[in-house]
């Protein structure tokens, strides 16, 4: 009898190894209940429904209000420019020193008045709640949720504190001069040291004892639809100084202000807002939050505490989405997937699975190659089997079910990334690859023939007529598979890790099902693996 036939016979003696008796198969280790889906699946989309009656109202009001408001805004900007010029004349380009004396007093007073006048001319009715803290009480304002470019109204209400802005914005004619008048912290996208310099500048200003203006930061770093608070970036919390949370609400029947990655454009929102009779906005200044010693040393802890307080006051949940999710959304769209397919809650994924953005982006390319043929950008069991070049079998369904965390019959990108990291990568170690190769190499000649490859997979998957020629040719450079080819393929395709280790589980189950005296008998086959040694290596559990 050939070694391949012997291997198949051994697998066949395992309880439940036969087709149709999968209930007795050694079950794949169940995953831990973790990585719960976020309470808000996509905070970066806004779909405002405008009825026919409302459309007629917008058109009628727009005929009168739109040109008037555009002219008023332009006039106010022109009036503000001379004050901004007086404030910034002879100031160094990098704003190394604060604007002081009469220039600061006159220009701040004039610009605050003109700022309020501009938002009033746009139709905004502003309600202010709470007490604004002094620079000594709270050097930093943190405003959320950040949902629109109109959120600049918080800066006007707070007394024109400094803001963090891109360096390119300061070069825009007219607008750039007005921006420089509030002494912003400028961030450069081309300077590799920009992040470090920005943090150092924030620390310098917030610890100046009131010499510099207060700083207003939108810690979310991007706009959302106000349905939740996403991850707060730690920049505003690194100095370890007291901060004052600022809540922003837009309690209007028709939302014409929300500016997200999927929704109305800048021009469309301006036109819709200007065509409203009025737009309500509430700016609430919460009590100052003073960090304790632990929070001073851990800005992420301080940021999370402040975020939770703000979310509780707003009555909305928090999620671990961040700006990197927006970048993944754009990448998903470029790969012809639905944009929302790229959402993974990047903060949680990167922290728990130790993945950086480049790693997740690489997985998105892999995911797109599988899901591009399906509707909705999700992987079904058929696409899963086609990608693995294997038929739909009971073992494959078990593996698919482990990826499918919410049991909806499909795998989304978030589930795919978690599955690779938690289920496949722990089983894809050098040791496991070596053991798997030895099991496939039945005659122990250092190479796997197509007959050996087919026999072991047929036995482990319980599919006696399995055709693996396509998969074999993808791995092998010639008529057989060397260890280097096997290892290279396993590392590039961690999805196969569970398939390759299924046969190990079968052998383990077989050994433990034998009488004790047989279990203790030394095996003469050099390519058998010890159950005790393998017990840990096949686990797909991972602490969260």
From Swiss-Prot:
Residues involved in Ca(2+) 1 binding: 404, 406, 408, 410, 415
Membrane topology: Single-pass type II membrane protein
The organism's place on the tree of life at top rank: Eukaryota
SMART domains linked: EFh, PlsC
Cytoplasmic side: 1-57
Span of domain EF-hand: 391-426, 428-463
Pfam families: Acyltransferase, EF-hand_5, EF-hand_7
Motif (EGTC motif): 220-223
Sequence ranges of Basic and acidic residues compositional bias: 530-544
Alphabetical keyword list: Acyltransferase, Calcium, Cell membrane, Endoplasmic reticulum, Golgi apparatus, Lipid biosynthesis, Lipid droplet, Lipid metabolism, Membrane, Metal-binding, Phospholipid biosynthesis, Phospholipid metabolism, Repeat, Signal-anchor, Transferase, Transmembrane, Transmembrane helix
Catalytic activity as recorded in UniProt: a 1-acyl-sn-glycero-3-phosphocholine + an acyl-CoA = a 1,2-diacyl-sn-glycero-3-phosphocholine + CoA; a 1-O-alkyl-sn-glycero-3-phosphocholine + acetyl-CoA = a 1-O-alkyl-2-acetyl-sn-glycero-3-phosphocholine + CoA; a 1-acyl-sn-glycero-3-phosphate + an acyl-CoA = a 1,2-diacyl-sn-glycero-3-phosphate + CoA; a 1-O-(1Z-alkenyl)-sn-glycero-3-phosphocholine + an acyl-CoA = a 1-O-(1Z-alkenyl)-2-acyl-sn-glycero-3-phosphocholine + CoA
Molecular-function annotations in GO: 1-acylglycerol-3-phosphate O-acyltransferase activity; 1-acylglycerophosphocholine O-acyltransferase activity; 1-alkylglycerophosphocholine O-acetyltransferase activity; 2-acylglycerol-3-phosphate O-acyltransferase activity; calcium ion binding; lysophosphatidic acid acyltransferase activity; plasmalogen synthase activity
Motif HXXXXD motif, residue numbers: 146-151
Biased composition (Polar residues): 518-529
Binding site for Ca(2+) 2: 441, 443, 445, 447, 452
Group of enzyme by EC: transferase
Region listing for Disordered, in residue ranges: 518-544
EC id: 2.3.1.23, 2.3.1.51, 2.3.1.25, 2.3.1.67
Main localization, broad class: endoplasmic reticulum
Example GO biological process: phosphatidylcholine acyl-chain remodeling
Protein family per UniProt: Belongs to the 1-acyl-sn-glycerol-3-phosphate acyltransferase family.
Domain notes: The HXXXXD motif is essential for acyltransferase activity.
Name of protein: Lysophosphatidylcholine acyltransferase 2
Gene, per the UniProt record: LPCAT2
């Amino acid at each position: 009898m050939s070694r391949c036939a012997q291997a198949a016979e051994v697998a066949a003696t395992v309880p439940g190894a036969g087709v149709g008796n999968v209930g007795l198969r050694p079950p794949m280790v169940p995953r831990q209940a973790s990585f719960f889906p976020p309470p808000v699946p996509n905070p970066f989309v806004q779909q405002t429904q405008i009825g026919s009656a409302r459309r007629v109202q917008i058109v009628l009001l727009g005929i009168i209000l739109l040109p008037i408001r555009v002219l008023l805004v332009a006039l106010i900007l022109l009036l503000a420019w001379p004050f901004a010029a007086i404030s910034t004349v002879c100031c160094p380009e990098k704003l190394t020193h604060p604007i002081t004396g009469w220039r600061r007093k006159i220009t701040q007073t004039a610009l605050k008045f003109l700022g309020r006048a501009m938002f009033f001319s746009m139709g905004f009715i502003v309600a202010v709640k709470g007490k604004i803290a002094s620079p000594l009480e709270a050097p930093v304002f943190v405003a959320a949720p950040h949902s629109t470019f109109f959120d600049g109204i918080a800066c006007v209400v707070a007394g024109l504190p400094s803001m963090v802005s891109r360096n390119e914005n300061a070069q825009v004619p007219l607008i750039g001069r007005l921006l420089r008048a509030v002494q912003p912290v400028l961030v450069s996208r081309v300077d590799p040291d920009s992040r470090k310099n920005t943090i150092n500048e924030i620390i310098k200003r917030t610890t100046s004892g009131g010499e510099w203006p207060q700083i207003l930061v939108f810690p979310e770093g991007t706009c959302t639809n106000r349905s939740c608070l996403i991850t707060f970036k730690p920049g505003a919390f690194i100095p370890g100084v007291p901060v004052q949370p600022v809540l922003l609400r837009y309690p209007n029947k028709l939302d014409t202000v929300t500016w997200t990655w999927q929704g109305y454009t800048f021009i469309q929102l301006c036109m819709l807002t200007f065509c409203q009779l009025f737009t309500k906005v509430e700016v609430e200044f919460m009590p100052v939050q003073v960090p304790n010693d632990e929070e001073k040393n851990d800005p992420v802890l301080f940021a999370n505490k402040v975020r939770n307080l703000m979310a509780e006051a707003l009555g909305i949940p928090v999620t671990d989405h961040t700006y990197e999710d927006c970048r993944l959304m754009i990448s998903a769209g470029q790969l012809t997937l639905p944009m929302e397919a790229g959402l993974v809650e990047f903060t949680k994924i990167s922290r728990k699975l130790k993945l950086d953005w480049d790693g997740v982006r690489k997985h998105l390319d892999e995911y797109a190659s599988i899901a591009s043929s399906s509707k909705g950008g999700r992987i079904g069991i058929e696409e899963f089997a086609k990608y693995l070049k294997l038929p739909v079998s009971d073992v494959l369904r078990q593996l698919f079910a482990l990826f499918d965390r919410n049991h909806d019959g499909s795998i989304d990108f978030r589930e795919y990334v978690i599955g690779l990291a938690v289920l496949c990568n722990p089983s894809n170690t050098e040791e496991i690859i070596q053991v798997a190769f030895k099991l496939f190499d039945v005659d122990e000649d250092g190479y796997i023939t197509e007959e050996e490859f087919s026999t072991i997979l047929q036995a482990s998957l319980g599919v006696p007529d399995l055709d693996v020629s396509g998969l074999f040719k993808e791995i092998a450079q010639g008529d057989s598979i060397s260890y280097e080819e096997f290892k290279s393929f396993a590392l590039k395709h961690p999805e196969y890790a569970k398939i390759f280790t299924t046969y190990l589980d079968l052998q383990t189950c077989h050994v433990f099902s034998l009488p004790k005296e047989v279990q203790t008998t030394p095996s003469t086959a050099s390519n058998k693996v010890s159950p005790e040694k393998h017990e840990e290596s096949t686990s797909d559990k991972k602490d969260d």
